[in-house]
């Protein structure tokens, strides 16, 4: 049992904040540890001296090493399988993605069921589309397979085959590159302020008195549409029409051009020299004002109330 130690003797607290001198503490009694202290046997503890060695049990290490070896080997295999598991499912996932094929040079009589029947033997098809315009089939289309592996097999088998005398081509469909188009339009209603373009694309917008613009029929059908070169029919329609008779106040003379002014719009020369009968009763100055010959003051006090100005 532990021996009780006497309490240490400390001096009384200092008076008036002046520390007092501490006396050295009494020495603690030392205990001799050279011998062994008897311990009650009911605790079941045994003390060993440093010179005594532990008895080695034969076969303890041999039995421990195989157990440790058998435990570490399965852990290594499981770790390797865990690392390799994310790599294997990635390949089937890529193969399961849909893939679209571009089929060109197909017969013009082919429709969607015909194209589906041709490619359906290689796998499940999600979508079939043949491109048409107003005249019919354009000779190409698209086939979308559920898996890319089926699409690759169909492309290898059908590319270059002859179908009704036409060699079809099957390739992987690629996304179309979209260019940035200018959306700003400085003109009203999308019409350009040009006489020829206006007559072709918007004849009713540039209509002038005395000019037979085709505002119905073919022109109305193409109004506001993307013509893509189809305006020749409209242009030829009003080009083939006979020129209108000249108007005395040259209302039809809008563009005094050497070509259009003489052929289409009547021209200023037709007004000046093709009216001998009208010139006898009335004459006009260079500004298009027509004065009556009976007015005695037409040349002194200005134009009379009977003059008219040509419509523009």
UniProtKB/Swiss-Prot annotation:
This is RNA binding protein fox-1 homolog 3. GO terms for biological process: mRNA processing; nervous system development; regulation of alternative mRNA splicing, via spliceosome; RNA splicing. Residues 100-175 form the RRM domain. Residues 49-87 have a biased composition (Polar residues). Residues 1-104 are annotated as: Disordered. SUPFAM superfamilies: RNA-binding domain, RBD. Keywords: Cytoplasm, Methylation, mRNA processing, mRNA splicing, Nucleus, RNA-binding. The record marks 100, 108-109, 133, 138, 142, 166, 176 as: Interaction with RNA. It comes from Homo sapiens. Pre-mRNA alternative splicing regulator. Regulates alternative splicing of RBFOX2 to enhance the production of mRNA species that are targeted for nonsense-mediated decay (NMD). The modification Omega-N-methylarginine is found at residue 223. PROSITE patterns: RRM (PS50102). The modification Asymmetric dimethylarginine is found at residues 223, 272. Residues 1-29 have a biased composition (Pro residues). The lineage of its organism: Eukaryota, Metazoa, Chordata, Craniata, Vertebrata. One of its GO terms (cellular component) is nucleus. One of its GO terms (molecular function) is mRNA binding. It comes from the Eukaryota. It is found in: Nucleus; Cytoplasm. Transmembrane segments: none annotated.
